[in-house]
């Protein structure tokens, strides 16, 4: 292959992945927390998009600087809502139980859907399915969680790979749940990883120039 990997806090990410078409690494960062002045890193994140899709769907933000975009929640709302293929690749840095990760995701998605009066029985059932998928797993260092969001039909395929095991997959088909899962990583000031938000803003600003 000969493709140079991109290092995100010492975690290698491919600069491009092929789904139905090539998607480029346009955002990278980490989730972390500071404990007693020490930075503890949990995951490294890569966000993959097609630059031509970005130009088509986000042209309204042409001419904005990365700093302007990073502080504009309307921009990130448009990104999450845009009918374009997206892949979010999450690599585990600090080991964690899958159940802990699942609960974080569940709480965020449920609370934000409830805020918008979109949390009904169908959403609850689908979210339980997602939590159940992660429940029994152990996220060793270098395990990979992949979210592959389809362009139009509100479907997300979640993949989980860990050392020595075949990738497991789950299809999520409730558009409200899928949309809010995207926003967990792509929602500007409320995104789970501020460093990823800044990186996406800088990259998309450059693409739109």
From Swiss-Prot:
Its EC number is 5.5.1.6. GO terms for biological process: flavonoid biosynthetic process. GO terms for molecular function: chalcone isomerase activity. Pathway: Secondary metabolite biosynthesis; flavonoid biosynthesis. It catalyses: a chalcone = a flavanone. It is an enzyme of class 5 (isomerase). Gene3D superfamilies: 1.10.890.20, 3.50.70.10. Induction: Induced by PAP1. Keywords: Flavonoid biosynthesis, Isomerase. Transmembrane segments: none annotated. Belongs to the chalcone isomerase family. Involved in anthocyanin biosynthesis. This is Probable chalcone--flavanone isomerase 3. The gene is CHI3.
